[in-house]
Amino acid sequence: SLWATPDQYVHACYSDIPSLYGERELDDDRWSYSSTTNAVEYPVLTGTVMWFFARVIPSGENEMLNYYRVNQIFLAGLFLFIAFIVYRIRPEFAYLSAIAPAAIASLYINWDLWAIISMMLSIYWFDRKKYTHSALAIGISISTKFLPIFLLLPIALILWRRNEIKELARYLGITVATFLLFNVPVM
């Protein structure tokens, strides 16, 4: 296996993607959350992405590598789309997201970009006062990674400062409902 030696750490090329493919039994046609002892520790939408890509790759000698490559392709596409969203939000800063060393270095470590893209869409729509779209996107983002839950605080403060209390309650309600929609069936 390409990631089975200590070299993955020495050469700074660790990735959860191939590691968890075998460790979480995705290579055995198992649903990400079916094991009571070895389930995926990621939130439900990330686990679904992991499971889906494990299903679409051809089985055979290079399964793990194929799994990694399919994920690489989609993560690269997400990275480019995130740069486009940043361009739509603030054109003068778009190049910064596209060449950010931390983003590039961590591009293929795990599936975080699936959460980042929905979080960026949430910011984009919030900025345009499309609160329903924004709340749906942040609910999806939280179902993909728990970090985006912290975006709710500044959103709540902005709506509170604008005295849009009903909109704040509606926003939080849509976010929670979206989160529950994806998570309750897996609980």
What are the residue ranges of the model-derived segments?
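TM-lumen/periplasm interface segments of multi-pass membrane proteins
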Residues: 1-87
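Alpha-helical transmembrane segments of multipass membrane proteins
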Residues: 46, 174, 178-182, 186
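Transmembrane-helix signature of polytopic, membrane-embedded enzymes
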Residues: 62-65, 83-102, 133
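Membrane-interface helix-boundary motifs at transmembrane edges
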Residues: 87-91, 128-129, 160-168
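Membrane-interface alpha helices of multi-pass inner-membrane proteins
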Residues: 101-106, 122-123, 132-156, 178-181
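Short acidic/glycine- and proline-prone juxtamembrane loop motifs at membrane-interface regions
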Residues: 107-115
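Specific aromatic-rich, kink-prone transmembrane helix
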Residues: 115-131
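Perimembrane helix-loop-helix junctions
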Residues: 150-177
